[in-house]
Each structure stands twice: as structure tokens, then as C-alpha cells.
Amino acid sequence: MSSKEQKTPDEQVLDQKEAAKGQQADAAPETADVADPRDARIAELEAQLSELQQRERDNMLRVRAEADNVRRRAEMDVEKAHKFAVEKFASEMLPVIDNLERALDTADKANESLAAMIEGVELTLKSLLDAVRKFGIEVVGDVNVPFNPEVHQAMTMLPSADHQPNHVMMVMQKGYTLNGRLLRPAMVAVSKAQD
């Protein structure tokens, strides 16, 4: 070997380092083109995480909406319970009111000896009607109003020149509502056009 070909150990190490750098430089473009499988896995997991977070937000919104609906329904149920708690009692009081009105209709008002009793029945009826009005009970018993099937029950239709067609011309039995809800329809005679 010639002296030029022989290298010192330091030179050999330098040559090896340069060769290694060259190989790394050559290999670097190849590895840059090849995707690291860990990066793909990370991207996949991030996508799953994002999807799960969105589902969780949607579920939370649904749960909150359902809770609000349950709360509102409960409040409405309590309100209805308070508003219509007296419905059964009111229904039982209607025949009492009817009987007092019938007693006044059939009483002999010309008889002076019955005047005090008639006045007592009138005051009792007035007091009872005032008491039930305080709880939202209203009388349905007007005449000369248009027939309303929601609060009237037509018992008969009669021809009449004095009333417009389809108007209440006579109330046979008064009806009642409780806070706008029908307790009992008014039984009425309805006018129809004369032939």
C-alpha cells in the first residue's frame, strides 16, 4: 500500500462519519415520503375524540331540554291541579243551585206569609253563587246569543220571528264553566228561520 492510501485512524473515523452523513442525507428524502404510522393513528384518534365530544354535547343538550320539558310539565300539572281541584265539588253543587232556583220559580210570591222565606232562599242562592264565582265558576245561560256547541246543548229548534236563526231563544237549564272548562252545558232551545 502506498502512503497515500493508508490513512490514520482519525482520518478513517472522519471518512466513516462523512459516509454516514451522506447515507443519512440519501435516506432522509425516502423517509420523508413515507408517513409515520403513529401520525396516522394520532389523526384517527383525534377524529374519534372530536366525534365523541360532539355526541356528548348533543346528549347534554337533549338531557337539558328533556329536564326543562319535565319541569314545565310538572309546573303545568300543579297549576291545573290548583285551578281545577274544586271541579268535582263544583259539579256536586250544581244541582243545589238548580233546586234553589226552581224553589224560587215555583214559590207563591203573592203570599205575604211566604215573603220572608222567599227572601231567605234568594239570599242563600245569591250567597252560594257569589261563593262559587270566587273559585272560577261562571254561569252559561244568556238568551239572544249565537248558539255555541262548546257550551250549549240544543234540546230543540223552534221557528221564531223574534230571534235571529241559530240563536239561543230559551234556556231550559243553565250551564256552568270552571275557569273556562265546561262543567255542564246549558240546555237550550235554538231558533231557526221561519218557513
UniProtKB/Swiss-Prot annotation:
- Chaperone listed as a keyword: yes
Q: Which residues form a coiled coil?
A: none
UniProt lists compositionally biased (Basic and acidic residues) regions at 1-20
The keyword Secreted is assigned to this record: no
| GO BP, one annotated term | protein folding
Annotated segments matching region Disordered: 1-40
Keywords per UniProt = Chaperone, Cytoplasm, Stress response
A Pfam family reported for this protein in Swiss-Prot or TrEMBL:
GrpE
Quote the cellular component terms of the Gene Ontology held in the record. Answer: cytosol
Entry GO MF terms: adenyl-nucleotide exchange factor activity; protein homodimerization activity; protein-folding chaperone binding; unfolded protein binding
> Where found?
Cytoplasm
> InterPro entries from the xrefs?
GrpE, GrpE_coiled_coil, GrpE_head
Q: How does it assemble?
A: Homodimer.
Q: What does this protein do?
A: Participates actively in the response to hyperosmotic and heat shock by preventing the aggregation of stress-denatured proteins, in association with DnaK and GrpE. It is the nucleotide exchange factor for DnaK and may function as a thermosensor. Unfolded proteins bind initially to DnaJ; upon interaction with the DnaJ-bound protein, DnaK hydrolyzes its bound ATP, resulting in the formation of a stable complex. GrpE releases ADP from DnaK; ATP binding to DnaK triggers the release of the substrate protein, thus completing the reaction cycle.
Family assignment from sequence similarity? Belongs to the GrpE family.
- PANTHER family from the xrefs? GRPE PROTEIN (PTHR21237), GRPE PROTEIN HOMOLOG, MITOCHONDRIAL (PTHR21237:SF23)
Instruction: Report the protein name in the record.
Output: Protein GrpE
Lineage runs: Bacteria, Pseudomonadati, Pseudomonadota, Gammaproteobacteria, Enterobacterales
Its gene name is grpE
